[in-house]
From Swiss-Prot:
It is found in: Sarcoplasmic reticulum membrane. Homooligomer. Can also form heterooligomers with other sarcoplasmic/endoplasmic reticulum calcium ATPase (SERCA) regulators ARLN, ERLN, PLN and SLN. Monomer. Interacts with ATP2A1/SERCA1; the interaction results in activation of ATP2A1. Interacts as a monomer with ATP2A2/SERCA2; the interaction results in activation of ATP2A2. The keyword Membrane applies. GO terms for biological process: positive regulation of calcium ion import; positive regulation of calcium ion import into sarcoplasmic reticulum; positive regulation of cardiac muscle cell contraction; regulation of ATPase-coupled calcium transmembrane transporter activity; regulation of slow-twitch skeletal muscle fiber contraction. Its main location: membrane. The chain crosses the membrane at residues 14-34. This is Sarcoplasmic/endoplasmic reticulum calcium ATPase regulator DWORF. The lineage of its organism: Eukaryota, Metazoa, Chordata, Craniata, Vertebrata. The transmembrane domain is sufficient to compete with phospholamban (PLN) for binding to ATP2A2. The keyword Aminoacyl-tRNA synthetase does not apply.
Length: 35
């Protein structure tokens, strides 16, 4: 049970980190363009 939960968490962690990285990248790009 615990292993399944950990596996699910690790599978969710990657897309969440990619999404956060993409959002941060967009914010930095907008900041650079408009500054």
């Amino acid at each position: 049970m615990a292993e399944k939960a950990g596996s699910t968490f690790s599978h969710l962690l990657v897309p969440i980190l990619l999404l956060i990285g993409w959002i941060v990248g967009c914010i930095i790009m907008i900041y650079v363009v408009f500054s």
